[in-house]
Amino acid sequence: MAPVYEGMASHVQVFSPHTLQSSAFCSVKKLKVEPSSNWDMTGYGSHSKLCSQSKNIPPSQPASTTVSTSLPIPNPSLPYEQTIIFPGSTGHIVVTSASSTSVTGQVLGGPHNLMRRSTVSLLDTYQKCGLKRKSEEIENTSSVQIIEEHPPMIQNNASGATVATATTSTATSKNSGSNSEGDYQLVQHEVLCSMTNTYEVLEFLGRGTFGQVVKCWKRGTNEIVAIKILKNHPSYARQGQIEVSILARLSTESADDYNFVRAYECFQHKNHTCLVFEMLEQNLYDFLKQNKFSPLPLKYIRPVLQQVATALMKLKSLGLIHADLKPENIMLVDPSRQPYRVKVIDFGSASHVSKAVCSTYLQSRYYRAPEIILGLPFCEAIDMWSLGCVIAELFLGWPLYPGASEYDQIRYISQTQGLPAEYLLSAGTKTTRFFNRDTDSPYPLWRLKTPDDHEAETGIKSKEARKYIFNCLDDMAQVSMTTDLEGSDMLVEKADRREFIDLLKKMLTIDADKRITPIETLNHPFVTMTHLLDFPHSTHVKSCFQNMEICKRRVNMYDTVNQSKTPFITHVAPSTSTNLTMTFNNQLTTVHNQPSAASMAAVAQRSMPLQTGTAQICARPDPFQQALIVCPPGFQGLQASPSKHAGYSVRMENAVPIVTQAPGAQPLQIQPGLLAQAWPGGAQQILLPPAWQQLTGVATHTSVQHAAVIPETMAGTQQLADWRNTHAHGSHYNPIMQQPTLLTGHVTLPAAQPLNVGVAHVMRQQPTSTTSSRKSKQHQPSMRNVSTCEVTSSQSTSSPQRSKRVKENTPPRCAMVHSSPACSTSVTCGWGDVASSTTRERQRQTIVIPDTPSPTVSVITISSDTDEEEEQKHAPTSTVSKQRKNVISCVTVHDSPYSDSSSNTSPYSVQQRTGHNGTNTLDTKGALENHCTGNPRTIIVPPLKTQASEVLVECDSLGPAVSTGHHSSSFKCKSSSTVTSTSGHSSGSSSGAIAYRQQRPGPHFQQQQPLNLSQAQPHMATDRTGSHRRQQAYITPTMAQAPYTFPHNSPSHGTVHPHLAAAAHLPTQPHLYTYTAPTALGSTGTVAHLVASQGSARHTVQHTAYPASIVHQVPVSMGPRVLPSPTIHPSQYPAQFAHQTYISASPASTVYTGYPLSPAKVNQYPYI
């Protein structure tokens, strides 16, 4: 054993054990801590690398430690590990090994009142006792001394566990475990016991004013954890309680998604609060030290900045201030496996913004915000200042403002950035410590004291610790310019540095009210890398995009899903029998992230036996999993279809876990025996196998109104852009998916036919508040023409689901994708409120979905519920102008440069046709209108998986390409299917330019989009009449796509964006981009760049008008090198997963389609 006790020396003495190289206590140096700094623990020893451990934390298990029987033990079946917190007055606990019979646990003194809480979600700093930071002062004379001793032990013969129950010859305090400073007296291999787990102390990791951190082994597992043992000194008791309360609040959030360190439990040991955290690898300060404090390239700073800004965004949304952000408190998770994956640690100084006190000592000095130094009121913005100092230190390799005192700190800031504003200095309570007011001037101004004046007043000598002295922050761009870059790479580096300095200046704004926020930081071009799109062929740019892959969300966010009040409402009835077989791949038995079962409570109603357990936690992570959600008959809003059978049974071949999006909990398992029963016949059921994890988190269905996600009050009073920015989806590499909603519609399913359900997710922007309120009220009886999905971007590294980010100005209408089984089948379906029919009478339309496992086809009949379709079907042209705002813009593509069938040579003329023989048609030649007042919307078309065949999609043909001068009009589209059209136009190859269009008033018409989801086979377009035929684009869905969205907020860009054709936008409205990566050499793929055009309508290609709720969803097929602009490279992002088909829900119906259960193989070299 190696007990630890506090000596009185001013340095650390080390008595090495027998194995010197394995000791965690060697090579520690003098600890320098600033006086009265709560958490200014700095520096690490040379052996600072910590072992990483498995992130799969099993559920809590009841401890077999003998404890007083009056203590209640928490239920081990709860989804989170439970915590027992003993009040500080209860004395201490003497613990034994797991099965020791020689010693019994006793609780000494104090009542037995216990507080149980859930897992906490952050790890505080793993700081080694050692390596001083430059210019830090120390006044604490205590030190740590390690002595090799062998105290009396109790050996358990049965289990072999050893517990040290006696102590050393050193004197201890009356607390029986603490010294005079309140630090716990550590004993190596000592056992720390919570109510659920037992931990053995392995190494001493570090200590600070908060206490100390030890590396422990969780007995019975192979997990290594870090336990933070807080001091029990009265002066730290209050802050310890605050830290525990903040960790308890953060325990409800996703630590991985928001880049917090996960904490497992909290317990009391010998009157000391112990916090158990996951073990991380290395902090950024050690990382810099390991690299000899060399500057870090911007391509590595960017992912660190993005992840920490995401953490600050979540803290800001919770009203929390970290208050001690610095390189030591940013930990690398696993540098070898996940380069530059970081998490924020140490919430010992954190507080709620409402409880912030101006005189409170906060933040380490180098990273201390001016408002703290001057004694001004502060808020979460102090963390953004600290983050700016951190990224500047990473860029320089040395602290930007390494002040040895607060005077030096404000002096450095003022010399580089200028004096704080006069109103700030006048309001500061500590201003007079560093500034003098010039009373001789008629306008008294503040003047910084000279170093001599300050030394004369305080006796503190000013020091110069800066490595770089800048007259302004812009001078930083000239530091450490790399010389090994040539050509475009050098231009990329210079552009990157300009954006970095621009962001840094906004983060280091002295006035906190004007300082950039975390969400704005995540939308800054430096983070989104929009400025790098000008250099698509640069290897440096490719490397930048690859490094940002680590910033993707691990799972889709579940917090915004819970805001959805609309459940999945779709009437499903079997067509020929009462049996429906659900077939799943055996691959679907893996749970990548263990979520909470709480969000599934609304779905797991009667007739839905669900069982929690741990059997479904598999060792092999499988991102290609699906989940089955079975909604019981008791689900509200599921009326039976009167013409169909009333019920059916469900059989499953193997158990499939239901995965929701709350990490750390257990999955739900549907047992086959329970699902094989026949359900009651009073109502129909929904079987929604969500096609990847975006659909697995189901919101609590407290209301069954067919309404949009955003409540009426919010839609009418709050700008949607602000509402969306309050969530974490300001990050475009860690996007958030809200729960989509399938709208009402009767769908007929055949017997014994495997099916999956997908929903095309769309997003809307806030229209005028009156418009939103009016539309919400107008469609309140049946919100069938309102999409209830609010989505920014959906991306998950644990799922092959690729993101679709859609930007719109008004609530969107759902787009519908149709499919046909053979060349002779012509399928039509109503779009929006317009029923597609051969005659003016309402009739059912069929959608035939061939499924690979079955030779038969599924016929889905879709009909409307009310007379709205009929009324709108006969609506005159005059009503269209009111409805055109509900139309979503789409991508257009040519068949070939010479295949334009229009007799009008003007590229901006509009040709209009009406439907004929039940076929919805649309023909626009890309009108550019100035007078249109309709708000444009865009939808990013989802790509198809490789198992799906070529898709025939009717799309608007654009005349001569609206070019920005970067590209020609000879972009070829590859297609493997031969298609014949009655107009005689071959669509084997097509060319065109992507355009942004708005709606234009015009005659009432409809559109058809037949889609073939079966194997590749020729198709024939439906017969049409009219002098002009619309061009047809054929999609060969064989490319995997890694879509990213890049907001473009730069006001300096002109109306026409250089990257895209005819892009008109406002500075406040970001552009959206989608990147693709080819899966193999010569493979074809789908790329869609859809940008909501803002501002000038002259650069906007517009639709002719058609009824509300029609959505154009047009994929564009292009080769690997064929993109709308040569400035956009097709392979900025390496593809990880193949595409699957997205299906959107229309107001009157819902389309189902089959998903391939196995992902397509991706080329190892996506950039070839």
Curated annotation (Swiss-Prot):
Region (Interaction with TP53 and TP73): 812-907
Motif Nuclear localization signal 1 (NLS1) in this chain: 774-777
Main subcellular location of this protein, as a coarse class: nucleus
Keywords for this protein: Apoptosis, ATP-binding, Cytoplasm, DNA damage, Isopeptide bond, Kinase, Nucleotide-binding, Nucleus, Phosphoprotein, Serine/threonine-protein kinase, Transcription, Transcription regulation, Transferase, Tumor suppressor, Ubl conjugation
Comp. bias intervals (Polar residues): 765-791, 910-923
One GO cellular component term: PML body
Reaction equations catalysed: L-seryl-[protein] + ATP = O-phospho-L-seryl-[protein] + ADP + H(+); L-threonyl-[protein] + ATP = O-phospho-L-threonyl-[protein] + ADP + H(+)
Region described as SUMO interaction motifs (SIM): 856-880
Active-site residues from the entry: 324
Species in which this protein is naturally found: Mesocricetus auratus (Golden hamster)
Ranges for region Interaction with AXIN1: 907-1022
Gene Ontology BP annotations: intrinsic apoptotic signaling pathway in response to DNA damage by p53 class mediator; peptidyl-serine phosphorylation; positive regulation of transcription by RNA polymerase II; smoothened signaling pathway
Protein name: Homeodomain-interacting protein kinase 2
Region (Autoinhibitory domain (AID)): 956-1168
Biased composition, class Low complexity, residue ranges: 792-801, 895-909, 965-991, 998-1018
Keyword Metal-binding in annotation: no
Record-linked PANTHER family: DUAL SPECIFICITY PROTEIN KINASE, HOMEODOMAIN-INTERACTING PROTEIN KINASE 2
Quaternary assembly: Interacts with CREB1, SIAH1, WSB1, CBX4, TRADD, p53/TP53, TP73, TP63, CREBBP, DAXX, P53DINP1, SKI, SMAD1, SMAD2 and SMAD3, but not SMAD4. Interacts with ATF1, PML, RUNX1, EP300, NKX1-2, NKX2-5, UBE2I, HMGA1, CTBP1, AXIN1, NLK, MYB, POU4F1, POU4F2, POU4F3, UBE2I, UBL1 and ZBTB4. Probably part of a complex consisting of p53/TP53, HIPK2 and AXIN1. Interacts with SP100; positively regulates TP53-dependent transcription.
Region Disordered, residue ranges: 764-820, 894-936, 960-1030
